[in-house]
């Protein structure tokens, strides 16, 4: 497979797009509260992206997707379509996935929110484990290792926490296209011999379930739910492989303050 190696000029553009994408997730947080609809959250994000940031919402009309963001609640694994009929309630766990296009370059990220700040013990642990699963993947990235080392590490951690890794959806290359090579699986499998090299840009975005790994696509052709109706959680970052590890291009200030990952990860 032909995996693009980004030039310094491209990297500058990607950093800009990624910062804008991460800013949307920070901006929307105060609005994620009981009584608000996912349709309203999407409109706030959409207007902020278009009017304030002057960027293009990448999800809107992508293969026919009707909204600017994906918003997935509780047992929805991914690709939840925002709707004025979906009202948030305290205890819901919510993923908001935002991708922006700035000057032809894509920035892609997502994070979890807990409505009201509290949920049941199992779902709280799930959300925490989803973030740590992403971080485990990020800490694995360095040049000259096999791509599938990422999935191996993510799967090992996730299953150690008594959760399961969704198989049907994966991380992906991203740059001047929304999705390109490589496919970044979050479980251990054949990777075709791909070796990570500096300048490769991709997302890591494990979706993990409180119950079994199996999922189903709903009648709208987009919304993916767990088959057993257990809750699901996901965090996503976009990163670039460096000479000594990776740069997390969509990192948020809150994460830097926590200290579990940094913008520049030295993993060698």
Curated annotation (Swiss-Prot):
Quote the Pfam families the UniProt record gives. Peptidase_M24
> GO cellular component annotations, sorted alphabetically?
cytosol
| InterPro entries named in the record | Creatinase/aminopeptidase-like, Pept_M24, Pept_M24_MAP, Pept_M24A_MAP1
Entry EC number(s): 3.4.11.18
Instruction: List the disulfide bonds in this chain.
Output: none
Q: Which cofactor does it need?
A: Co(2+); Zn(2+); Mn(2+); Fe(2+)
Which amino acids does the record list as binding substrate?
79, 179
Q: Which UniProt keywords apply?
A: Aminopeptidase, Hydrolase, Metal-binding, Protease
Biological process according to GO: proteolysis
Which residues are noted in the entry as a divalent metal cation 2-binding? 108, 172, 205, 236
Copy out the cofactor comment.
Binds 2 divalent metal cations per subunit. Has a high-affinity and a low affinity metal-binding site. The true nature of the physiological cofactor is under debate. The enzyme is active with cobalt, zinc, manganese or divalent iron ions. Most likely, methionine aminopeptidases function as mononuclear Fe(2+)-metalloproteases under physiological conditions, and the catalytically relevant metal-binding site has been assigned to the histidine-containing high-affinity site.
Q: Where does a divalent metal cation 1 bind?
A: 97, 108, 236
Q: Which reaction does it catalyse?
A: Release of N-terminal amino acids, preferentially methionine, from peptides and arylamides
Q: What GO molecular-function term can you cite, just one?
A: metal ion binding
Q: Which family does it belong to?
A: Belongs to the peptidase M24A family. Methionine aminopeptidase type 1 subfamily.
- Its biological function? Removes the N-terminal methionine from nascent proteins. The N-terminal methionine is often cleaved when the second residue in the primary sequence is small and uncharged (Met-Ala-, Cys, Gly, Pro, Ser, Thr, or Val). Requires deformylation of the N(alpha)-formylated initiator methionine before it can be hydrolyzed.
Q: How does it assemble?
A: Monomer.
Name of the protein described by the UniProt record: Methionine aminopeptidase
Q: Tell me the organism.
A: Haemophilus influenzae (strain ATCC 51907 / DSM 11121 / KW20 / Rd)
Organism placement in taxonomy: Bacteria, Pseudomonadati, Pseudomonadota, Gammaproteobacteria, Pasteurellales
């Amino acid at each position: 497979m032909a995996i693009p190696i980004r030039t310094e000029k491209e990297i500058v553009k990607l950093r800009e797009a990624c910062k804008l994408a991460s800013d949307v997730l920070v901006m929307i947080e105060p609005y994620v509260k009981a009584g608000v609809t996912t349709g309203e959250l999407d409109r706030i994000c959409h207007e902020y992206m278009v009017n304030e940031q002057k960027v293009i919402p990448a999800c809107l009309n992508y293969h026919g997707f009707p909204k600017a963001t994906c918003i997935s609640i509780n047992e929805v694994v991914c690709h939840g379509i925002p709707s004025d009929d979906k009202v948030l309630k305290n205890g819901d766990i919510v993923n908001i996935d935002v991708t922006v296009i700035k000057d032809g370059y894509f920035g892609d990220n997502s994070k979890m929110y807990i409505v009201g700040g509290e949920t049941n013990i199992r779902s709280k642990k799930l959300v925490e484990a989803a973030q740590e699963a992403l971080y485990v993947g990020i800490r694995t990235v360095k040049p000259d290792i096999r791509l599938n080392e990422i999935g191996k590490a993510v799967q090992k951690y996730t299953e150690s926490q008594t959760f399961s890794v969704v198989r049907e959806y994966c991380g992906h290359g991203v740059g001047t296209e929304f999705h390109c090579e490589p496919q970044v699986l979050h479980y251990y499998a054949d990777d075709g011999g791909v070796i990570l090299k500096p300048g490769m840009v991709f997302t890591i975005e494990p979706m993990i379930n409180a119950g079994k790994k199996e999922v189903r696509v709903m009648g709208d052709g987009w919304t993916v739910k767990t088959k057993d109706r257990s809750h699901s959680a996901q965090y996503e970052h976009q990163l670039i492989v460096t000479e000594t590890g990776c740069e997390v291009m969509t990192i948020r200030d809150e994460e830097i303050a926590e200290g579990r990952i940094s913008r520049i990860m030295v993993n060698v």
